[in-house]
């Protein structure tokens, strides 16, 4: 993609777009919430559908000229239903947070109670953090992982639910490396008459491929984003039983959003179609294997992992034991200098600030898309360890940067 048309009218933006393409090709994207979509998805997202207003739903729009918008949305919905086995799917949310908003608006009144996973223990802002709309509209209490194991404590969660009597329990995570037992959370919700929303934003692709247990058919609502492990472009999705369909649809539009982003929905349709190919199951399995290999190799280098490992696409490193004087922010910055891009992250029982926390979160979806296998992931883990163990050593940085450049050349993303 040369951006010739952009360069003709706006060379500054063209330079930025070209620079970003080179950055993605020439660095290792290890932020757990990022991935590389296909050229086909990008082409769909840059289509003429960006020009089309299509308020409403297929067959019931508030504008004319929506026949092809209807075709695209119907394809996206049908493919999502096939992927996840869901009764009802809404593909209009602009993001995972918008999907969560749709569920809240469909089911809760201001002041209702939500029980969700604490942000520093792996939750997400939209699950009720005070800085987020959910924390401002609803009464929120939060459960935590077990202090010893770093894993969800389902018995403690149930006891918390019994005491708090929430209207909704939110499950799911942004930085929890273990498989979630949805049925146990559903049982806690059933015991107090609460609804259960499972947010699978990070593991949408793993669930679709059978690499993580599915909450579809267990939880009342399943939300997610479409640009992390499933590679369908930026956006959100809501799945539910048919009984909730009308409430969800009206909460998304007109409740929370106006016109849907039809060009993004086209990207979702294409990405979901790609995920229906058997090769996607192989990809998802490799994502999980690569994360396990990455974690094990880092442990061999003396690093401590939250929960002791991973079952998913991400590894959460707690630096306090191995490198107590180094923050996650320090590591993030130094690794980016050598071409490894990840993010600082809070860890359970965080002792630093959220702006400069004690951990780093590392994901494997994007590198797996590029073709990285277990051997390559061991090399990446070695590079990460060398930089952290030798913070500030420019000779080490130069050597690691050369290794990263070789890996990028060996596994190109966008030709």
From Swiss-Prot:
Keyword field contains Amino-acid biosynthesis: yes
Residues recorded as bearing N6-(pyridoxal phosphate)lysine in the entry: 228
Cellular location(s): Cytoplasm
Binding site residues for (6S)-5,6,7,8-tetrahydrofolate: 119, 123-125, 353-355
Any one GO CC term of the record: cytoplasm
Documented EC number(s): 2.1.2.1
Site (Plays an important role in substrate specificity): 227
Enzyme class: transferase
GO terms for biological process, alphabetical: glycine biosynthetic process from serine; tetrahydrofolate interconversion; tetrahydrofolate metabolic process
Similarity-based family: Belongs to the SHMT family.
Function text: Catalyzes the reversible interconversion of serine and glycine with tetrahydrofolate (THF) serving as the one-carbon carrier. Also exhibits THF-independent aldolase activity toward beta-hydroxyamino acids, producing glycine and aldehydes, via a retro-aldol mechanism.
NCBIfam families according to UniProt: PRK00011.1
Protein's name according to its UniProt entry: Serine hydroxymethyltransferase
Native source species: Halobacterium salinarum (strain ATCC 700922 / JCM 11081 / NRC-1) (Halobacterium halobium)
């Amino acid at each position: 993609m040369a951006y010739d048309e952009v360069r003709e009218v706006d060379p500054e933006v063209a330079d930025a777009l070209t620079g970003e393409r080179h950055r993605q090709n020439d660095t290792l994207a290890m932020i757990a919430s990022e991935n590389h979509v296909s050229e086909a998805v990008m082409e769909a997202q840059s289509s003429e559908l960006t020009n089309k207003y299509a308020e409403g739903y297929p067959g019931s729009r508030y504008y004319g000229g929506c026949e092809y918008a209807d075709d695209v949305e119907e394809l996206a919905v049908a493919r999502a239903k096939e992927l996840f086995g869901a009764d009802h799917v809404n593909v209009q949310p602009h993001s995972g947070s918008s999907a969560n908003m749709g569920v809240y608006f469909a089911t809760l009144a201001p002041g209702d109670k939500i029980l969700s996973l604490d942000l520093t223990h792996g939750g997400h802002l939209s699950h009720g953090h005070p800085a987020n709309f959910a924390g401002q509209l609803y009464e929120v209490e939060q459960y935590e992982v077990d202090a010893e194991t770093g894993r969800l404590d389902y018995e403690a969660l149930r006891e918390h639910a019994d005491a708090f009597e929430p209207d909704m329990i939110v499950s799911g995570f942004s930085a929890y490396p273990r498989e979630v037992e949805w049925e146990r959370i559903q049982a806690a919700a059933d015991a107090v008459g609460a609804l259960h929303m499972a947010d699978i934003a990070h593991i949408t692709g793993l669930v679709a491929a059978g690499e993580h247990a599915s909450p579809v058919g267990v939880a009342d609502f399943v939300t997610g984003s479409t640009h992390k492990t499933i590679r369908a472009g930026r956006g959100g999705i809501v799945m539910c039983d048919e009984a909730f369909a009308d409430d969800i649809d009206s909460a998304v539009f007109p409740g929370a959003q106006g016109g849907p982003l039809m060009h993004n929905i086209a990207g979702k349709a294409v990405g979901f179609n790609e995920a229906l190919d058997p090769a996607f199951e192989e990809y998802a399995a490799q994502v999980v294997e690569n994360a396990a290999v990455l974690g094990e190799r880092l442990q061999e280098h003396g690093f401590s992992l939250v929960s002791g490992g991973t079952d998913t696409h991400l590894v959460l490193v707690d630096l306090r034991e191995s490198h107590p004087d180094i923050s996650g922010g320090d590591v993030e910055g130094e690794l980016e200098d050598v071409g490894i891009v990840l993010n600082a992250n809070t860890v359970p029982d965080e002792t630093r600030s959220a702006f400069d926390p004690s951990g780093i979160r590392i994901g494997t979806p994007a590198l797996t898309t590029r073709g990285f296998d277990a051997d390559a992931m061991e090399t990446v883990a070695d590079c990460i360890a060398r930089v952290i163990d030798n913070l500030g050593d420019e000779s080490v940085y130069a050597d690691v940067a050369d290794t990263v450049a070789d890996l990028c050349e060996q596994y190109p993303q966008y030709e």
